[in-house]
């Protein structure tokens, strides 16, 4: 008696598994379930996804055609080289005064620095 009941249970479980697999497949099984894509729908889908798939060359070209972003405030007055050097030396002197150490300025102004 145990043999036929185990066989019946196995058959029922197999039938349930197969029916679940058949119903869960993503592809339409019958002709009535197929989508009928009209040309207008296809154009809509192409337009909705078309910008997502730009080639690398067109992206590079678009980036190259754009002007570079402005990185500084255009209203700033630029310092001349002597003004920048004076500002740099003043900040060095201030840092030396804050440290209180003896600093030999001749090391900064050696002749070999100016012979390039």
UniProtKB/Swiss-Prot annotation:
Top-level division of the source organism's lineage: Eukaryota
Induction: Down-regulated in omental and subcutaneous fat of obese animals.
Gene Ontology cellular component annotations, sorted alphabetically: dense core granule; extracellular space; transport vesicle
Site feature location: Cleavage: 35-36, 52-53, 72-73
Xref: InterPro entries: Spexin (IPR028126)
Compartment list: Secreted; Secreted, Extracellular space; Cytoplasmic vesicle, Secretory vesicle
Positions of the pro-segment in this chain: 27-35, 50-116, 74-116
A molecular-function term among this protein's GO annotations: neuropeptide hormone activity
UniProt KW keywords: Amidation, Cleavage on pair of basic residues, Cytoplasmic vesicle, Hormone, Secreted, Signal
Region (Disordered): 52-77
Gene Ontology biological process terms in this record: negative regulation of heart rate; negative regulation of renal sodium excretion; positive regulation of gastro-intestinal system smooth muscle contraction; positive regulation of systemic arterial blood pressure; positive regulation of transcription by RNA polymerase II; regulation of sensory perception of pain
Compositional bias (Basic and acidic residues): 53-75
Glutamine amide, modified sites: 49
Entry function: Plays a role as a central modulator of cardiovascular and renal function and nociception. Also plays a role in energy metabolism and storage. Inhibits adrenocortical cell proliferation with minor stimulation on corticosteroid release.
Name the record gives this protein: Spexin
The gene coding this protein: Spx
């Amino acid at each position: 008696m145990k043999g036929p009941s185990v066989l019946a249970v196995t058959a029922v479980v197999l039938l349930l598994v197969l029916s679940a697999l058949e119903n869960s497949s993503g592809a339409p099984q019958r002709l009535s379930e197929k989508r009928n894509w009209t040309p207008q729908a296809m154009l809509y889908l192409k337009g909705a996804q078309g910008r997502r798939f730009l080639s690398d060359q067109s992206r590079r070209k678009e980036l190259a055609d754009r002007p570079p972003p402005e990185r500084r405030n255009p209203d700033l007055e630029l310092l001349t080289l002597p003004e920048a050097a004076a500002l740099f030396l003043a900040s060095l002197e201030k840092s030396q005064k804050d440290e209180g150490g003896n600093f030999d300025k001749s090391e900064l102004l050696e002749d070999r620095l100016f012979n390039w």
